[in-house]
């Protein structure tokens, strides 16, 4: 059967019976849709009757919200799918205006409409499919040539008949003051509320948080998106999506799921944000992790003469397949870890480089562990060129940079034996941009020439991959000598600790050294592959092996020699 880029899944089974069926339903849908799957909830709708079904309001109860969590949790097994549960027809008891008569536009108009509704004979019965297509197009903007499929998932022998759940689902949402509730208890609506987060690589746990906030809010939802100082403590912050990109994805998702709401997406620059100062806000949605932050917001409001916000705490989604060193919850941090070793952007085409040898430029801030990664790559078969060693060669008496450097900086930079005292030379140029440029204008072209000669040597030895290990790779403009730039990153605090331990410098001196270099973010912005030595050595080894295996695949699949 054809695979569609976008689809609409209409769920008609009563919620209590639907929860145990979710996994096979989502698996069936994931075989047909490969990008965006919208989900429309209409429990009890009959597509087999004589009358054309109409969309009707679904009251927002704790059962509905818990079901939304179950669905997004199940969708996490199909991460290629961008699942979006549409909330237009889900209403709180206190706000039940009529459903909009116009068709709702969607960012990715469905090419196929699917349903869990089943005919008695298990066939693709045309009248039912026609009802389904008419229903879908009456609610949402769909592609002109809309297809329809009745899903008949394999529920397994032990699953049917399905018994209603007598025990409420685990609570997804908890008000700050716990109250006894039943699954059928309506959720209270509010006019205006807020939610905040980083929202990097919008995932299913984010979608639960945002969906609950959208159900609670009836007029406006303020969404604080963490930026600047609030990002510094994040794991692998260099791999965070830019603020504008995160906001763009957020906005599309929010407008898709509840276009009747007004959304105010603003940068979150401190822990309180608008929730701490806006008197018109009534509630704040937090996660288990950020609940204490929500309490702090309320204390801040009270101190400033504002009423407390009603806090709604959302459970975290468990990651069903966490890898070593990853969190056991669905999180952006884990997704960023999974990016390590992957190709982030297309390689450079370098027809001017020697054919038959693929050249990697390896860089990273001081203390990043770049050289240890180079040795791991060497162990896998790469020919490694150490630019520091080339620098030593160029400075040595008789070396290509020796005489020009002495002429530029004088003989007082020499040891008694005539060799260049690099410590004295370093003190001359450190903090003096003019003097540093004089030195780099002499040395960098020489090192680049020596590196090219080393690449030629690698080709002569039959090496397929050559790695240029260079801290100044990008500052020196040597990216034009490589097909890919690989960067090793670690937090600056860890880099300082390593430099102090390795080189015997003070923390201030170590920080000064780092400030004189390109930042990890600047390096990553121009990189094709990112690695990190933050964890145990065997974790780094696995990263390098993954990156190496993917590199070999790229080389073998290349249409011609690089």
Swiss-Prot record:
GO terms for cellular component: mitochondrial matrix. It comes from the Eukaryota. The modification Phosphoserine is found at residues 177, 182. Residues 359-562 form the DPCK domain. CDD domains: DPCK, PPAT_CoAS. Its EC number is 2.7.7.3, 2.7.1.24. The N-terminus is blocked. Residues 179-357 are annotated as: Phosphopantetheine adenylyltransferase. SUPFAM superfamilies: Nucleotidylyl transferase, P-loop containing nucleoside triphosphate hydrolases. GO terms for molecular function: ATP binding; dephospho-CoA kinase activity; pantetheine-phosphate adenylyltransferase activity. Its main location: cytoplasm. It is found in: Cytoplasm; Mitochondrion matrix. It is an enzyme of class 2 (transferase). Keywords: ATP-binding, Coenzyme A biosynthesis, Cytoplasm, Kinase, Mitochondrion, Multifunctional enzyme, Nucleotide-binding, Nucleotidyltransferase, Phosphoprotein, Transferase. The keyword NAD does not apply. ATP binds at residues 364-371. In the central section; belongs to the eukaryotic CoaD family. HAMAP family: Dephospho_CoA_kinase. Bifunctional enzyme that catalyzes the fourth and fifth sequential steps of CoA biosynthetic pathway. The fourth reaction is catalyzed by the phosphopantetheine adenylyltransferase, coded by the coaD domain; the fifth reaction is catalyzed by the dephospho-CoA kinase, coded by the coaE domain. May act as a point of CoA biosynthesis regulation. Monomer. This is Bifunctional coenzyme A synthase. It comes from Sus scrofa.
């Amino acid at each position: 059967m054809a695979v569609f880029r976008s689809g609409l899944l209409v769920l008609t089974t009563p919620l209590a019976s639907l929860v145990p069926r979710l996994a096979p339903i989502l698996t069936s849908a994931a075989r047909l849709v490969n990008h965006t799957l919208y989900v429309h909830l209409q429990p009890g709708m009959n597509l087999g009757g004589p009358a054309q079904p109409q969309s009707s309001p679904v009251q927002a109860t704790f059962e509905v919200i818990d079901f939304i969590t179950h669905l997004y949790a199940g969708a996490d097994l199909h991460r290629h799918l961008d699942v979006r549960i549409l909330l237009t027809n889900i209403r709180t008891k206190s706000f039940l205006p009529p459903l909009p008569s116009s068709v709702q536009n969607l960012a990715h108009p469905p090419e196929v409409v699917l349903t869990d509704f089943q005919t008695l004979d298990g066939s693709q019965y045309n009248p039912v499919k026609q009802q389904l297509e008419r229903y879908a197009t009456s609610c949402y903007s769909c592609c002109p040539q809309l297809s329809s499929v009745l899903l008949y998932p394999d529920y397994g022998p032990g699953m049917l008949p399905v018994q209603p759940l007598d025990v409420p689902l685990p609570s997804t949402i908890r008000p700050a003051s716990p109250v006894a509730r039943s699954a059928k208890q309506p959720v209270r609506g509010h006019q205006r509320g807020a939610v905040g987060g980083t929202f990097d690589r919008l995932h299913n746990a984010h979608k639960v948080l945002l969906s609950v906030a959208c159900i609670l809010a009836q007029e406006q939802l303020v969404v604080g998106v963490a930026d600047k100082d609030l990002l510094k403590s994040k794991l692998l912050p260099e791999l965070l999506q830019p603020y504008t990109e995160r906001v763009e994805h957020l906005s599309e998702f929010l407008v898709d799921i509840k276009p009747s709401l007004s959304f105010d997406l603003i940068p979150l620059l401190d822990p309180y944000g608008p929730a701490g100062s806006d008197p018109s806000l009534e509630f704040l949605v937090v996660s288990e992790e950020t609940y204490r932050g929500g309490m702090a917001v309320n204390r801040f409001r009270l101190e400033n003469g504002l009423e407390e916000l009603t806090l709604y705490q959302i459970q975290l989604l468990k990651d069903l397949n966490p890898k070593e060193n990853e969190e056991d919850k669905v999180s952006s941090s884990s997704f960023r870890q999974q990016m390590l070793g992957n190709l982030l952007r297309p390689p450079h085409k370098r027809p001017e480089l020697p054919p038959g040898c693929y050249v990697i430029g390896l860089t990273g801030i001081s203390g990043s562990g770049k050289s240890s990664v180079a040795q791991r790559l060497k162990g896998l078969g790469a020919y490694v060129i150490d630019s520091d060693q080339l620098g030593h060669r160029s400075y040595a008496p008789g070396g290509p940079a020796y005489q020009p450097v002495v002429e530029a900086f004088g003989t007082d930079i020499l040891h008694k034996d005539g060799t260049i005292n690099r410590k004295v030379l370093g003190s001359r140029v450190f903090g003096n941009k003019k003097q540093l440029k004089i030195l780099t204008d002499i040395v960098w072209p020489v090192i680049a020439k020596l590196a090219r000669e080393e690449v030629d040597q690698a080709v002569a030895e039959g090496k397929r991959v050559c790695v240029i290990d260079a801290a100044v790779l990008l500052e020196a403009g040597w990216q034009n000598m490589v097909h890919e730039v690989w960067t090793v990153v670690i937090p600056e605090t860890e880099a300082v600790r390593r430099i102090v331990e390795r080189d015997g410098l003070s923390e201030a001196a170590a920080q000064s050294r780092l400030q004189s270099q390109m930042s990890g973010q600047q390096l990553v912005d121009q990189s094709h592959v990112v690695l990190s030595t933050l964890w145990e050595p065997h974790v780094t080894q696995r990263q390098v092996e993954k990156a190496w295996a993917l590199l070999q695949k790229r080389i073998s699949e290349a249409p011609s020699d690089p």
